Amino acid sequence: MKSNLLCLSWLDADNVMNYGQILQGCAMMNILRQITQGKIVYLSYFSRGPKRIVKYYLDHYNLSTGHLFSYLKTRKTIKSFIRNNRICFSQVHNESQINKKTKNIELMICGSDQIWHPQNYDKIYFLDFGDDSIIRTSYAVSLPKTQIEKQFIGVYHQISYSLRRMNAISVREKGSVPFIETLSGKKVYDVLDPTYLVDREIWYNSIEYIKILDDYIFVYIPNGMDNKMSEFVDKIKKRYCILNVLVLITRGDSCFLDATRLKYVSVGQFLYLIKNARCVVTSSFHAVVFSTIFHSDFFCYDVPNPNRGEDIRLIDILSKLGLQERLVNSDMLDTSKRIDWIAVENAIEKNRCYSWNFINNTISMVGKNNDQ
């Protein structure tokens, strides 16, 4: 196919610690190039004015934190995906910038990741802009809810309205499908995160070596830890007879007294830490994804965030892969059960086929639209 496509999500090396949004964006670039030989425009959208941009750079890019070095390495990884897949990439901050990029576009795709979370509502993430003749679809967007929550009532009315312009909708969480069908009045499909759809050799080739002398447990908790976290990891340490714990958190304090806290690592180093860990302990969706891609033993420790409300991301991906027992807390931990990686791979392959069917059916909509 030679149709011209536009993909809108977030893919921002500035936010170097949000590894999931970077990896899903790189995966989407590869997927888009597989489905068209035409022009591909990838827009990384985040609404922020000049003052916020300047403040962000002043806060993050001083040499003393180590952030700058990781940022430069991560930006290099992103540029490699842009170059290898021949992508017209832009970071945009308002609708006026976006409209300039939609000329001769036949299909617009939004996704993946949590761009539809009600706390982040912005009509741009629903492709609620541009000419009505353009086909609009979502791929693996995450709105990890099963019901309307009190703090987001007003936002859901806006979401429902924005969904009306979508021609086809796919989301990442199966548990959210009935809810989004109610909001949109349309058929909704659940599909795999795009990181599962690309050749895993791509991820192996993106790994950056870190010199770590001893076996280690990798703890990645993006949104802070609770008081029971150290008890949970202590049990993991005893199970594996490992003392070396590497902790990476993006906000909040570490509850560990005898662990090495990592400040900033590049996206390639993040992949290395997952692949080579004896065990991964995480509350991150994409750390779970890459643990399964690399066949690294892992456990999920969910840390609720009251401000963001209900969040079904972890239980949904674990259920999809038959790994529900990996979601545990400090009072409930069975480390004796091994992961059946053959069963996991079979589940991934089944869902991968279903996901590609959705993508191919979406592409066929462009052909039908051109014939009219």
Q: What does each of the following model-derived ranges do?
A:
Residues 1-372:
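Active-site anion-handling motifs in enzyme catalytic cores
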